[in-house]
Amino acid sequence: MSDADVYAAALERTFNYTNTFFHMQPVLDIRAPAQQHLGRYDFVVSSDVLEHVDGPCVNALRNLRALLKPGGLLALTVPYGFHDTTIEHFPELHEYRIEGEGANRVLVNITQSGVEQRFSDLCFHGGDGSTLELRIYAYADLERWLADVGFVDIKLHSNEHPQWGIIHQDPLGLPITARAG
């Protein structure tokens, strides 16, 4: 999955590692990964990606599990908090587009029932700021969904590793690892 250059460069020097993208080659769409990716990997790094993936959260996690060989490792960072449930910014997201530019961007959504919704004050991440934040996970949901789709040995890591860019300025979004059961 797409991750920061600091991770990708180091991993490429050490392993047979490929950093993938949603918008350019090499492509990996975690919503529907190509057959060639299934059951192939010893480890997958997902660094601040899942909050941008549309569709049900559990689908992306199930597909992450499907990428891994049995016993394979998922290393995951994603914004989460210790609130009761995952916060979906656009719970009826169905057919959507972004209109406008800069601070004037608006998300236009057509719900499954055909109702048009318009949202402003959007939160964008990454690169040129074009990647829309769709949700903030609740840690309890994330942990439960990982287990539900077949991950075991789910661990929250609080140690810092500055050489890898793991610096905890906030306890929310600490790295998580899980093994494919």
Report residues per predicted region.
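Class I SAM-dependent methyltransferase SAM/SAH-binding core
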Residues: 2-35, 82
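A short SAM/SAH-binding and catalytic strip from SAM-dependent methyltransferases
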Residues: 42-55
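Residue-level preference for short coil/turn positions at secondary-structure junctions
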Residues: 13, 37-40, 70, 171
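Conserved Rossmann-like nucleotide-binding pocket used by diverse enzymes
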Residues: 18, 45, 75
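S-adenosyl-L-methionine-dependent methyltransferase catalytic module, highlighting the catalytic core
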Residues: 21-22, 55-181
